[in-house]
Amino acid sequence: MKKFALLFVLLMSLAAVLLAACGGSSGSCGSSSGTSSGSAPTVHMCGNNFVQTSITISKGQSLTLVDDASAAHIIANGSWVNGSAQLKKEPGAPVVNNLQFNGNDSKTIGPFNAAGTFRLYCTVHPGMNLTVIVQ
């Protein structure tokens, strides 16, 4: 009986460590600011979320995504809706077909040449959506 109790405690401790490693955000994540003066619009990714969920950019601009943590991301056109991934090619949006981030890197999407509202999502992390508003 003592061996069973010890095994149970060890398994629960391991589960707690794994859950803590997968969730939350670290203190080393990027700024929530959408742009810096004089630079391209930027959205940071931290853990399993975009630091900000929407950004407004000007027609003709590109968007830089920055992965501030070691989490891998695969970004595509579309969004998560009620826990289900909805791949969607939107007219006027640059095609984003499984753009891979392997942690601590950045990539640029665009240019966004048409005005409108476009959606991007991480195919790996449910609920990780970004709305890009182009004016």
What kind of region is each of these model predictions?
Residues 1-9:
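Bacterial N-terminal signal peptides that target proteins for export
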Residues 5, 17-18, 22-135:
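Extracytoplasmic copper-binding redox domains, predominantly the cupredoxin/blue-copper superfamily
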Residues 11-16:
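Core hydrophobic alpha-helical transmembrane segments of single-pass membrane proteins
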